[in-house]
């Protein structure tokens, strides 16, 4: 679009220049036209453009002066001064013409004025064009900068998202691995417990009963036992001890609870009955009152085997 505008401006400028050149050449033609050669048989004044009527009048005056007698001295002066007066009038006419010519601006001056206006207009257009180009350049640079910043921001977001995804994936894999190991450990302990049970079945029945009785008595005597210590005492694994205690609780051989600290608290049937009787008598009991009463109703002090037999 800008190229078409520039081509149109160039064509218009060329037309103006050609027009000015033709006008200047036309105005300068009368000044530079060579003088024509004088025609033969034509008076000098006629060749110089003097009117024919004036020439005839001058000829008549000349003949009258030749045929007339000599005039008085006072009358001769005016006759002699007449041509001079006409000559002065001719000079005045020529001076007036020269003054008129001086008042008319010549072609070069006219072309210079018109050229200055045109040049100022062209310079203004050129300045606007350069300004538009600079604005377009700045706009393009700004777009490029914004696109670069957007690409960098998107790249940073993608990088952060990838890091977060890897972190979540690592946590998930670690959790799965931990659960898998725990499950494998559980299966191993379960298999070992099954082997121990099979060994008991294959062994002597009296020995099995003795070991089981010792296991139960150890818990009753100590009242509060650490499961790991119990496993070491009977050469079992901790999970095997937990499974055996749960089995004994299920068949009613042992009564108690396993807390979250890895301990089993044994409570006898008599102690449970005393606690139940206390709750029934009081009706509604708070946890604080129950805890205070349980310390009196439930004995958590380890007792010896002899003491247990005496009490029984």
Curated annotation (Swiss-Prot):
Its main location: endoplasmic reticulum. GO terms for molecular function: ubiquitin-like protein ligase binding. The chain crosses the membrane at residues 3-23. Residues 52-85 have a biased composition (Low complexity). Residues 110-163 have a biased composition (Basic and acidic residues). It comes from the Eukaryota. Residues 90-99 have a biased composition (Acidic residues). GO terms for biological process: protein ufmylation. Keywords: Endoplasmic reticulum, Membrane, Transmembrane, Transmembrane helix, Ubl conjugation pathway. SUPFAM superfamilies: Winged helix' DNA-binding domain. It is a single-pass membrane protein. Residues 24-312 are cytoplasmic. SMART domains: DDRGK. Substrate adapter for ufmylation, the covalent attachment of the ubiquitin-like modifier UFM1 to substrate proteins. Required for ufmylation of Atg9; protects the nervous system during aging, possibly by stabilizing Atg9 and supporting its function. Interacts with Atg9; the interaction is transient. Belongs to the DDRGK1 family. This is DDRGK domain-containing protein 1.
